[in-house]
């Protein structure tokens, strides 16, 4: 896909929801975008065709004259467009037929169906975005919390790319000094080794400061999966309902009513959280319930955090011990539910298990009590605290973390080379590795195969 030949591409830029979408957009980009649009769009009246001016009219099949849709057209001529090429958007009525027929007309008129992420790839190749900005667009589209969106917008505005380019420039400056001494050793004064050591230390510290945000950034981007597990009738479904503030799960006094996983999407301290209410885990002869129990075990094994829920009035039982043993390889937070059934004195007297838990939280889910304590314990367990009050300028992805780690490791080797007083040729090897790794974050010198992989993860039309 990389290295396009200047052809004109087209794609549907909005989600296709059959019979529900109010507006659908077909996007064109390339040298022939305006010509193709003129072939299929009939302007109503005497409206002037100007860049960034919306036109009203009709989409017609140029061969048969058949009316396809009543629409708006927005031309955005180069370089003032998303791709820095001529871009035309056709705003149709939503639903399947109008946008699909309009797209087919564009292709018949000479456009090519865009590949995933090709509009953003062209924006990158034409210099409108660096690679970190391009990746942030996909993050913004998939953001599941306001904080994740804020981080994506910060990166889109260059708040990650700018410090990365500064780090790369500093490494280039050091490399230039070193190579100058290699080529013109007799004509230049010796290197100021103390100054270079200080520069390397400062650059490494700046890299570490960026890397220190990686774990929290990953949580913002991908979120947490939490499984509520426990024996039947301890209040797992009530806990989910209280937490999600709606009746997501059926609650009865009869044990074993939850047979399948019930899922709820929440935001806890700025982190997207997928909560799974599982079937009560116990030995049972009911075949359907057995399936639910097995799904519960699998859900717990795949969760980032397990909420092992017990009944305060029953205390820690042998069944609870068995469940704990089944999930003990996962981080576990103990939730003691139905605290309202015990007096204060009885709560202090209850025999708590000796196992290690991330935290122990008392709740009364039926009365919606203890939820704030539960959320605080979860944030403490994952080591983030509340992220809603922080200003997020970026959220590193795994590729960026790997590149920064490579650069940091290479700079450490340069420091070791300096301390060992090895020849300058050894310096250049590691400096070049650091420069290449930093450049890969913003897209400088990155391999075409890597670009294809990155942009293939985008949706078609973006």
UniProtKB/Swiss-Prot annotation:
Binding site for (6S)-5-formyl-5,6,7,8-tetrahydrofolate: 27, 89, 128, 462
Cofactor remark from the record: Binds 1 potassium ion per subunit.
One MF term in the entry's GO annotations: GTPase activity
Binding site for GTP: 233-238, 252-258, 277-280
Record's subcellular location: Cytoplasm
Residues annotated as binding Mg(2+): 237, 258
Keywords: Cytoplasm, GTP-binding, Hydrolase, Magnesium, Metal-binding, Nucleotide-binding, Potassium, tRNA processing
Role played: Exhibits a very high intrinsic GTPase hydrolysis rate. Involved in the addition of a carboxymethylaminomethyl (cmnm) group at the wobble position (U34) of certain tRNAs, forming tRNA-cmnm(5)s(2)U34.
Family: Belongs to the TRAFAC class TrmE-Era-EngA-EngB-Septin-like GTPase superfamily. TrmE GTPase family.
Summary of subunit composition and partner proteins: Homodimer. Heterotetramer of two MnmE and two MnmG subunits.
Protein name as catalogued: tRNA modification GTPase MnmE
Organism: Synechococcus sp. (strain ATCC 27144 / PCC 6301 / SAUG 1402/1)
